[in-house]
Swiss-Prot record:
Keywords: ATP-binding, Kinase, Lipid A biosynthesis, Lipid biosynthesis, Lipid metabolism, Nucleotide-binding, Transferase. The gene is lpxK. Belongs to the LpxK family. ATP binds at T60, V61, G62, G63, T64, G65, K66, T67. Pathway: Glycolipid biosynthesis; lipid IV(A) biosynthesis; lipid IV(A) from (3R)-3-hydroxytetradecanoyl-[acyl-carrier-protein] and UDP-N-acetyl-alpha-D-glucosamine: step 6/6. This is Tetraacyldisaccharide 4'-kinase. GO terms for molecular function: ATP binding; tetraacyldisaccharide 4'-kinase activity. The keyword Nucleotide-binding applies. GO terms for biological process: lipid A biosynthetic process; lipopolysaccharide core region biosynthetic process.
Amino acid sequence: MALSDRLLNAWYNGHPALKLLRPLECLYRRVVTGKRQRFLAGEGAIYQPPVPLIVVGNITVGGTGKTPLILWLVEHCQRLGLRVGVVSRGYGAKPAQLPWRVSAEDCAAVAGDEPLLIVQRCGVPLMIDPDRGRAVQALLAAEPLDLILSDDGLQHYRLARDLELVLIDAARGLGNRRCLPAGPLREPAERLQSVDAVLYNGAVDDRDDGFAFHLKPSVLVNLRSGERRALEHFAPGQALHAVAGIGNPQRFFNTLETLHWRPVPHAFADHAQYSAQALTFTPSLPLVMTEKDAVKCRAFAADDWWYLAVDAQPSPAFVAWFDTQLMRLLPDRLLP
């Protein structure tokens, strides 16, 4: 088991050795708390975009379903007639220059897997740059936009924001509620009290402190041909190889089991780079992966490789709340 996997297991399931990391946790807390206090005090250079900006992020390490929710937010805003763009750090991306506008024809090595997925799925203008303020400026110089979504960046305080949405895995919660490296938190748990909304991925109902949303499998897509098949393409009990290089691979494997398939799980590191050899398994079975992994595997995919597309399904209460926020932020663009 890789060190990162061991840490995740310890953070969410407990391990006595984590006590040894508490001095480092105290140092980390001081650094991140001081960073936020300087932001609140207006110290340092902070870029204020001329259009509303919404941050969609985490306070935990590991997958929370952020990319599917961003896709939902983009498509929802587009349905309302809003011109929306996205900025992202572009984790793992190696573009020729920064900032870089992602094209649907880019490869994942250039654009990053998540930004490429977002552009290919909904055609939204998207700029990557670790300096998100610079990414926003470049995006606005290229496109007349009403609204910008920041893919992650909750802790990127040099970029002012109008709304903060934080995602939490409902099953794992905040783990041991400790900050890095003794726990999975990027910021102390109290930070949740200052965000605008918390969304719990996998929650059945809304909670007093947040909204529920879940990921709904929608269709199987063949990596080579692009052919779309209903989920019934695989009969109940079908054995298949399951590949997931995401923050929480087990969630993907569990989803396949809820569809009554029998996945042989192959978990990879988040943002893993693949090759045909790395994905050659025995026995020979159909292979199903996440959409995020698929953008990196199309060039060498076999005929029986598929990805499972999933759609975020936020609660009606969140949709109503979000529409109210959009009305507040963009009163001239959205008439009541």
